[in-house]
């Protein structure tokens, strides 16, 4: 926990010095509790991090999937409710990170990391608004990574170059929705089959029939110490990995034509995931555990990022007709559980979301075994972007369901 304390101290120290200098100092330091939850969380994040590059506790510039996740959700809030400051906040990160020639600060294509692709999704919208060619070039640069990204024999992308032969559920979210949207926006219909294959391939490699869950990852080569020698699968089903996978479905399906071969197979898998989410929901709180296949076990805990991801995916899945309307009850119970158990509001109305796993992975230089003790002992922190972003998205779905029509200041 010490590392998190130090990071938070540094971030807060930097922010206190920058607050008076930031154009967002005009943003009220109080949050109106009468506003919708999605807007309240966005305004709270903008208070915590006056400069958008500071999201995810960053003391310096970083091109990262967390920024993409949060800024995408913020643009959704802007689209629904207005407030130009929200758009400008997202634009500031894009303008800072994308150079005039379309290169991206801190992005190294040759690393072949799917994590670096996710932020491209909000850049689509920035380009759509600005028509600045540098964003079009940046999108093409990220898309070109996928042409040469290392793959397994079945066409599945490696999660990263440093993780050879490995398929992580996290990576499906990081790469596939961007891939699908790029194909849609650029009339590259031949790519849909490859996008769909990423989902189907991940399901084949990670499904655990004994526990009826999808495990965090699979090493197709069976060489990693964390991998089962027969299946190649990791030891457990990590909540957030399943959350990433579920969100990937509902976001990518937006762009894949209904007639496309294999799309129906995606829907079958997503329906299976929805049934797993329903079965694993904690009956008392409506939430989900950090390690899904050990729900309720000693040391396991109800975790906010997977809970918000599941709720968003179910809400959107029902709205889009991907899953049965009966799942709406599961989503509503989960959303209310999030508000009751994870959301805190301070005296100024600033909203926080608590109890998020900061990070979890497999292998690496400081080796991560992927056993039960590993997952339950990773750092837990508040206002992690991987909980904040999906909470905003889930809240927007809830507000759409309630037909909330609050008009936020559009100046």
Predicted feature locations:
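Bacterial Sec-dependent N-terminal signal peptides
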Residues: 1-30
């Amino acid at each position: 926990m010490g590392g998190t304390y130090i990071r938070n101290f540094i971030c807060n120290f930097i922010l206190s010095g920058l607050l008076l200098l930031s154009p967002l100092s005009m943003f009220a330091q109080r949050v109106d509790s009468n506003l919708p939850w999605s807007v309240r969380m966005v305004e709270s994040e903008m208070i915590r991090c006056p400069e958008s590059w500071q999201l995810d506790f960053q003391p310096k510039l970083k091109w990262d999937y967390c920024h993409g996740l949060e800024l995408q959700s913020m643009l959704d809030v802007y689209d629904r409710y207005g407030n130009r400051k929200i758009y400008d906040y997202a634009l500031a990160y894009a303008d800072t990170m994308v150079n005039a020639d379309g290169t991206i600060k801190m992005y190294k294509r040759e690393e072949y990391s799917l994590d670096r692709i996710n932020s491209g999704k909000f850049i689509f919208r920035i380009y759509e608004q600005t028509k600045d060619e540098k964003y079009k070039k940046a999108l093409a640069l990220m898309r070109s990574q996928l042409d040469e990204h290392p793959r397994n024999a079945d066409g599945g992308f490696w999660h990263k170059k440093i993780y050879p032969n490995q398929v992580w559920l996290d990576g499906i979210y990081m790469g596939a929705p961007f891939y699908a949207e790029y194909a849609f926006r650029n009339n590259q219909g031949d790519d849909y089959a490859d996008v769909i294959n990423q989902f189907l391939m991940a399901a084949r490699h990670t499904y655990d029939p004994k526990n009826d869950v999808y495990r965090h990852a699979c090493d197709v080569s069976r060489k990693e110490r964390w991998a089962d020698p027969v299946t190649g699968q990791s030891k457990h089903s990590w909540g957030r990995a399943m959350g990433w996978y579920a969100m990937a479905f509902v976001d990518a399906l937006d762009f894949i034509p209904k007639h496309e071969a294999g799309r129906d197979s995606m829907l079958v898998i997503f329906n299976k995931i929805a049934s797993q989410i329903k079965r694993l929901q904690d009956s008392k709180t409506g939430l989900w555990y950090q390690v899904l296949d050990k729900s309720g076990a000693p040391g396991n805990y109800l975790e906010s990022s997977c809970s918000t991801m599941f709720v968003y995916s179910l809400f959107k899945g029902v709205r889009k007709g991907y899953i049965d309307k009966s799942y709406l009850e599961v989503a509503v119970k989960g959303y209310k559980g999030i508000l009751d158990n994870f959301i805190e509001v301070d005296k100024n109305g600033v909203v926080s979301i608590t109890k998020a796993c900061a990070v979890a992975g497999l292998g690496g230089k400081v080796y991560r075994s992927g056993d039960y003790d590993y997952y339950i002992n990773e750092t837990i922190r508040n206002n992690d972007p991987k909980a904040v972003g999906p909470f905003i998205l889930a809240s927007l779905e809830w507000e759409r369901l309630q037909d909330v029509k609050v008009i936020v200041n559009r100046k």
